[in-house]
Amino acid sequence: MPKQDRAIRTRRTILVAAASVFEEHGFQAATITDILNAAGVTKGALYFHFQSKEDLAYGVMAAQGRHMGVVPPRACKAQEVIDTVLLQTYRLQKDPMVRAGVRLAMDQHASELDRGTSFQDWGKGMTLLLDAAKEQGELLPHVVPSDTADLVVGAYAGVQSMSQAVSGYTDLNHRTSVLLRHIMPNVVQSSVLTTLDLAPERGAAIYAEIQALMEAEELAGASA
């Protein structure tokens, strides 16, 4: 295996292990020793890629942000807003990296970390989608895209936190669908609202769609 590929795999292994430890113990209680044991790598290998526990936490949060990804484009930009939320819901239930990133962002005891970046980045992405929706005439006249983006991100943070505490995310699909059904009628035109798909199971379908697109791109790249 080429040295660069091996380094990438090692870094990924360390991040996955760190995500597992942070998800289980939180930032303060997690230790480098716990992460080393979970990763099965040497201390030298870990410190080659990450200089500290804080550095590891930022790596997990950055990976979580990338895993949120960008949903496939839709003619209706309001649907893209919904798809972004539903995709995050699916990944929270299925991906330990996403769960760990969210736990770190919500961890009030992790005072050493800049926890606001995750929320701000998601809010910026939501604002761009809502700006596009406004340009297409999909939004009600009173809607300010940046304000609505902050509302969606903040409300979702609370809903997912409650779901994690109450059911370990098993009811997150339902809670997310309820949230969207209450928010969207106050955001989009009635003619747009009737076209939106808010089904809880849509997140899994979006994830499968993204995976299929990625596989097609890889095949195209391999045959080029």
What are these regions (language model features)?
Residues 1-25, 29-41, 51-58:
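Basic, helix-initiating cap at the start of DNA-binding domains
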Residues 58-59, 187:
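Short, Lys/Arg-enriched C-terminal cap helix and immediately downstream tail that follows
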Residues 59, 69-98, 149:
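Hydrophobic alpha-helical connector segments
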Residues 64-67:
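Conserved phosphoryl-transfer catalytic core
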Residues 79, 83, 91, 124, ...:
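C-terminal peripheral helix-coil segments that are non-catalytic and often amphipathic
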Residues 88-142:
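Short secondary-structure transition hinges
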